C-alpha cells in the first residue's frame, strides 16, 4: 500500500511490464520455435495437473463482502473521475454495464451521482441498491434502451470478457455516452490468459483451454463430480482482438488511460507444452496479458 501511494501508477505499470517480459523471455523463445500442429493433452495429464493446482478461495457473496467490494470499486471510479476527466463537476449521470448486484452504483449514488445499472440477469440485483435509488434494469448491453448521449460516464468491471459481442457493446456505449463523456472499462481474465476459461470451481489447471479439448474438460468435470463448465460464459476474445477493436474506433474514442496487466506465474506450462499454445495463437502476449484497464474520452 505504501508503494502504491509513493510511486505513480503508470511508473509501477512500466516496471511490472518490464519485469514480466524479462521473466517470460525464455518461454517466448520456446513458443516461437514450436510447431503449429494442433496438439491437445490427455486425461492422465489433466488428472495429474489437477492435483497440483489447488482451488482458489471462494468469492464472497455475503452482504458484507458485496458491500466492501462495491465500496472499493466505487472509490476507484471516483478517483478516476477526479484525476483523469476534464469536467469533474459535470459528471453526474453514470451508467454501469454488467452490474450484477449494483453495489458499485449504490456507493456512487451516495456521493450524489445519478446512477443506472444494467445486467442481462436480474437475480443478482441487491435490494439495498434499489432502496437507495439506483435504477437497476435487466437489459442486454448490446442493445441499450436509452436515448443517444444520455450519460456523462459509463463504466464496466469484469464484464467485457463475458459479453458475446464486445464490439456491439462498445458501439452502444459510444452511442449513449455524451460527446466529451467517458467510457471506463476494467476486465479480465482474458480468454487466452491462465484463468481465461473462468472454470474456477471445476478445472484448476492454468491454461486448461489450450492444453485440453473442451469435450475432455467437460467429461472430466462430470466424472470428478465438479461443477459443470459453462463454456458460453466467455467470448474467447484475445488481447489481440481487443486491441483491434480499440483501433477500429480510434476516430471516436481517445485513450486517456491504457494498461495491459500481465500474469507470468505459469510460464512452465508454455515451456513444457509449447505446441499446445502455438497451434492456437501466434501472438505470445495473448498468453501473458491477464486483464485490460482503459479510459476512453468520446471525441466524435
State what each model feature region is.
Residues 2-143, 153-157, 287-292:
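Conserved N-terminal segment of class I S-adenosyl-L-methionine
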Residues 102, 163-168, 194:
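Short N-terminal helix/helix-N-cap motif within the alpha/beta-hydrolase-1
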Residues 129-130, 194-199, 266-271:
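Short aromatic-enriched loop/helix-cap "lid" or pocket-rim segments at secondary-structure transitions
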Residues 158-162:
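Short catalytic micro-motifs in class I SAM-dependent methyltransferases
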Residues 167-182:
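A short glycine-rich, Lys/Arg-flanked "PGG" loop and its adjoining helix->strand segment in the class I
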Residues 182-215:
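Conserved class I S-adenosyl-L-methionine
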Residues 225-241:
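Acceptor-substrate binding/catalytic loop of class I
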Residues 249-300:
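C-terminal lobe and adjacent flexible extensions of AdoMet/dcAdoMet transferase-like proteins
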